[in-house]
UniProtKB/Swiss-Prot annotation:
GO molecular function: cysteine-type endopeptidase activity; cysteine-type peptidase activity; serine-type endopeptidase activity
Disulfide feature: 135-178, 169-211, 270-323
Signal peptide from the UniProt entry: 1-17
Taxonomic source organism: Homo sapiens
Distribution of this protein across tissues and organs: Predominantly expressed in the thymus and testis. Also expressed in corneal epithelium, and to a lesser extent in conjunctival epithelium and skin.
Name assigned to this protein: Cathepsin L2
Reactions mediated catalytically: The recombinant enzyme hydrolyzes proteins (serum albumin, collagen) and synthetic substrates (Z-Phe-Arg-NHMec > Z-Leu-Arg-NHMec > Z-Val-Arg-NHMec)
Residue numbers annotated as active site: 138, 277, 301
PROSITE patterns reported for this sequence: THIOL_PROTEASE_ASN, THIOL_PROTEASE_CYS, THIOL_PROTEASE_HIS
Localization: Lysosome
Activity control note: Inhibited by CST6.
Family: Belongs to the peptidase C1 family.
Glycosylation sites: 221, 292
SMART domains assigned to the protein according to its UniProt record, in alphabetical order: Inhibitor_I29, Pept_C1
Length: 334
């Protein structure tokens, strides 16, 4: 065979193996890499660009359908842009749901005239949005958020609490640090330990380390925890209205949640049982003039303020326990 033909065929094979990218997205790709400080090796660059581009086009398709009234929320590119959904689920899946019988049961107030909307941020109960980064510690952020609120309720002082303290020190209670945990076990740790350090004295580093709890830096305590009736949104609503921010878990493993930006989140494939992410309900409300329509739970996430709506998400409310928002709700007793 003619050597030149062999070489031509070989080069054609190499060229066909190189991913074809949308050149119209080049500027956005370079801007995204600069914003999120991504540096790839030669072999990884093409793969990550392909994943990012697929995600970008999915987002654009969704937002086009949103403008046609097919969805109630928008999506946007963010720090998870170069991750497949499977990679995202593996990295961010941090909630380990377990039966834990040491808690009290929330006694629903009878004949309570509940407000149409609640936002504990406006009352000073909620610290700024934090970022768990690559560590599977969502459970710790959910737990500190609830405890911060209850300590404010008791003392009138809002102090940011140490998630790293929980990550490093609550393994005896059954938590697994950056490999996941359970908010109720975090509350149990605080009770058994006799306190929890402040974020300032025990800062977050997003990796598992040895326990460095110092009693003299403790700024919070609890006497155990209370669980809200599983799956009952009305009970959760009463707890949020009368107690304060509540720790909950949800199914957050979908691409639609990975790139959520604004609006009321509703995912048809969301599970009310298979929960993988701990978050904090800080209120509830509705959009529009009619309080019976477009109801939502106001949820604080732990993926930084750049994700979602300044770090928050509105989850569809009274939609059959959507995404399991009321399946595993609890709060510390202070």
């Amino acid at each position: 065979m003619n050597l030149s033909l062999v070489l031509a065929a070989f080069c054609l094979g190499i060229a066909s193996a190189v991913p074809k990218f949308d050149q119209n997205l080049d500027t956005k790709w370079y801007q995204w890499k600069a914003t999120h400080r991504r540096l790839y090796g030669a072999n990884e660059e093409g793969w990550r660009r392909a994943v990012w581009e697929k995600n970008m086009k999915m987002i654009e398709l969704h937002n086009g359908e949103y403008s046609q009234g097919k969805h109630g929320f928008t999506m946007a590119m963010n720090a998870f842009g170069d991750m497949t959904n499977e990679e995202f689920r593996q990295m961010m899946g941090c909630f380990r749901n377990q039966k834990f019988r040491k808690g009290k049961v929330f006694r629903e107030p009878l004949f309570l005239d509940l407000p149409k909307s609640v936002d504990w941020r406006k009352k000073g109960y909620v610290t700024p949005v934090k970022n768990q980064k690559q560590c599977g510690s969502c459970w710790a952020f959910s737990a500190t958020g609830a405890l911060e609120g209850q300590m404010f309720r008791k003392t009138g002082k809002l102090v940011s609490l140490s998630e790293q303290n929980l990550v490093d020190c609550s393994r005896p209670q059954g938590n697994q640090g950056c490999n996941g945990g359970f908010m109720a076990r975090a509350f149990q740790y605080v009770k058994e330990n006799g306190g929890l350090d402040s974020e300032e004295s025990y800062p977050y580093v997003a990796v598992d380390e040895i326990c460095k709890y110092r009693p003299e830096n403790s700024v919070a305590n609890d006497t155990g925890f209370t669980v809200v009736a599983p799956g009952k949104e009305k009970a959760l609503m009463k707890a949020v209205a009368t107690v304060g921010p509540i720790s909950v878990a949800m199914d957050a493993g979908h691409s639609s949640f990975q790139f959520y930006k604004s609006g009321i989140y509703f995912e048809p494939d969301c599970s009310s049982k298979n929960l993988d992410h701990g978050v904090l309900v800080v209120g509830y409300g509705f959009e529009g003039a009619n309080s019976n329509n477009s109801k939502y739970w106001l949820v604080k996430n732990s993926w930084g303020p750049e994700w979602g709506s300044n770090g928050y998400v509105k989850i569809a409310k009274d939609k059959n326990n959507h995404c399991g928002i009321a399946t595993a709700a609890s709060y510390p007793n202070v």
